[in-house]
Amino acid sequence: MITLTELKCLADAQSSYHILKPWWDVFWYYITLIMLLVAVLAGALQLTQSRVLCCLPCKVEFDNQCAVPWDLLKGSENASSNSGLLLPLPLRIQNDLHRQQYSYIDAVCYEKQLHWFAKFFPYLVLLHTLIFAACSNFWLHYPSTSSRLEHFVSILHKCFDSPWTTRALSETVAEQSVRPLKLSKSKTLLSTSGGSADIDASKQSLPYPQPGLESPGIESPTSSVLDKKEGEQAKAIFEKVKRFRLHVEQRDIIYRVYLKQIIVKVILFVLIITYVPYFLSYITLEIDCSIDVQAFTGYKRYQCVYSLAEIFKVLASFYVILVMLYGLTSSYSLWWMLRSSLKQYSFEALREKSNYSDIPDVKNDFAFILHLADQYDPLYSKRFSIFLSEVSENKLKQINLNNEWTVERLKSKLVKNSQDKVELHLFMLNGLPDNVFELTEMEVLSLELIPEVKLPAAVAQLVNLRELHVYHSSLVVDHPALAFLEENLRILRLKFTEMGKIPRWVFHLKNLKELYLSGCVLPEQLSSLHLEGFQDLKNLRTLYLKSSLSRIPQVVTDLLPSLQKLSLDNEGSKLVVLNNLKKMVNLKSLELLSCDLERIPHSIFSLNNLHELDLKENNLKTVEEIISFQHLPSLSCLKLWHNNIAYIPAQIGALSNLEQLFLGHNNIESLPLQLFLCTKLHYLDLSYNHLTFIPEEIQYLTNLQYFAVTNNNIEMLPDGLFQCKKLQCLLLGRNSLTDLSPLVGELSNLTHLELTGNYLETLPVELEGCQSLKRSCLIVEDSLLNSLPLPVAERLQTCLDKC
């Protein structure tokens, strides 16, 4: 037998799902319990009470009905007097029935004559109740829905109990209490100083978000910081909410299952209300039982009594009332689901009241679950929404970040870079720790692979900050921070992971002198938008661009006329149009790297103030235009390295002011004698070519300090090379030298000598005369050092070890 506890479990879901049950689900639950009690009571009465009592056998039948003998006799006399006939009375067997015969008749009449509704009424009530209970709890146990609901309830309880939720709600209450005070203060300021109001209004017009600043005289009630454990727990909840939302918002299976449950309930309600009242009239107290058992008892018809008829009528009527209440609430819930947009849930009201204005609206099953939770208690959705807000998550990340990155840990990251500046390099963090602004000695701040960085007003504490590097990171600058950067920042390096637009705050850095942009999008045609931006960078002197362009952007040539250095790395894409270079008359240094240039652009020859030209990693095969460089009287540095140049034109001798010449990594086989007319040369790089000899005329380069012919095919060095007394760096590695002239000892200023990769067998003793040569700067095989006489080797070793 099914116990009451087991029946209760069928009608009630797990208690953990109570927050997902609206008031009608609770109402259904209690009605279902009462229905179960009705079914159990009716079943118990039917099992314990006598079913049918057949105590009165019918001895006389008249007109196919049971009649009392004298009534039958009176009727017969009337009939005979009218017809004139005398009907004989039927004869019957006169004997009493045994108790076993009565029991037999009871059983036969119960099975054959009692209406089926009266017999199965308790079971029908039980069946209906079980169907109602199953429909109410099916969505809680169906695998596709129960897993999502269980996950949601688990997360919701964690959100409700998290200290971060309490902190966030407290911040909202605190800010709402502070706002009236701020408004009253602002009205007072507006009434007393109209000029300052205009200034504030102009600042508000900038297209950047205002920072959330607290009033100095009011202490925030949420100033307490979460400990590390609580912060990690809140962080885990944020991740769970993200994954849950991504998973649940894709489908609406919970909504559809819940809707189908209610539709089944309404259909069952209509069915019960239709047939139960109709068959209720078949439950009668008296039953006329006509059965063919006359051979056993002597009677054919019996007058029976169904003792449970009246109480079953009462229970059935009460059951109908319960079903009507159940059906009406089911109809209301169906109307609620069809009327409302339950697949969309908006936090608009909450966004207006709280300081988390970025709480997103949700859809599908996620929205439906929140609607159900609102029917139970709207506070659950409010607390849950805290973990949907990116602003809230960023605040938590900031707190966790501050706990992890203390001042001591940040100070240990400070280093001196190659420019002898104090630099802090932060890599792959969740944000910018607040303790960074305590490092007042920092000069360079480098941020790499940090998804969201916000520079608050506290950046003004970095009084020595002059350089900012932002690599593959998103940087948002507050107004007070922007004002500080405008006055102090001199160098800015921006590198984007994907092609992106230049942040608007860059154009407000009026004192910026060097700007390095990698992976940004610059329009090739001038527009009013960029006209308003670039023209404010009046102090910009150096611009580095790394992108794929077909022409030099017009915003650079037209809006930055005072630019002195322009570097363009085109990443191998062909740079077609260069005519607009003529406008940059103040340019002193020009770098066109990886632009797939086949010839030297003629527009370069109009840059009269040009000092340095770098055409590295292009596709230059000939440089016949080199004669035109004589129109650039200030040109002192020419870099044509990493190309496919086969020869140097004789006209190079016209570049009398040339001081540095880079021709490495080409296909040059010989040097023209006119090259040595460039007597001002002090840096000459001819490494990685196909040279076989060096002309004796190199002696005319009396100012030569750096000479590199690494990785060539040179077999002998001219004596004229050793007449370059100012030579400091001599790179002769990976050639075919078999002998080093003793004249090398005359290079008293030599500090760096490379000889490795040749066919030398000994080193000249005269190396001892190179007083400035250090051991770390002598690149030679150890076996050659051992070939020197011992006194010379020891003396040279002693001199070299002083480095």
UniProtKB/Swiss-Prot annotation:
Catalyzed chemical reaction(s): chloride(in) = chloride(out); iodide(out) = iodide(in); taurine(out) = taurine(in)
InterPro entries: Leu-rich_rpt, Leu-rich_rpt_typical-subtyp, LRR_dom_sf, LRRC8_Pannexin-like, SLRP
Protein's GO biological process: monoatomic anion transmembrane transport
Matching Pfam families: LRR_8 (PF13855), Pannexin_like (PF12534)
Superkingdom in the source lineage: Eukaryota
GO terms for cellular component: endoplasmic reticulum membrane; monoatomic ion channel complex; plasma membrane
Record's function text: Non-essential component of the volume-regulated anion channel (VRAC, also named VSOAC channel), an anion channel required to maintain a constant cell volume in response to extracellular or intracellular osmotic changes. The VRAC channel conducts iodide better than chloride and can also conduct organic osmolytes like taurine. Channel activity requires LRRC8A plus at least one other family member (LRRC8B, LRRC8C, LRRC8D or LRRC8E); channel characteristics depend on the precise subunit composition.
Subunit organization: Heterohexamer; oligomerizes with other LRRC8 proteins (LRRC8A, LRRC8C, LRRC8D and/or LRRC8E) to form a heterohexamer. In vivo, the subunit composition may depend primarily on expression levels, and heterooligomeric channels containing various proportions of the different LRRC8 proteins may coexist.
Name of the molecule in the record: Volume-regulated anion channel subunit LRRC8B
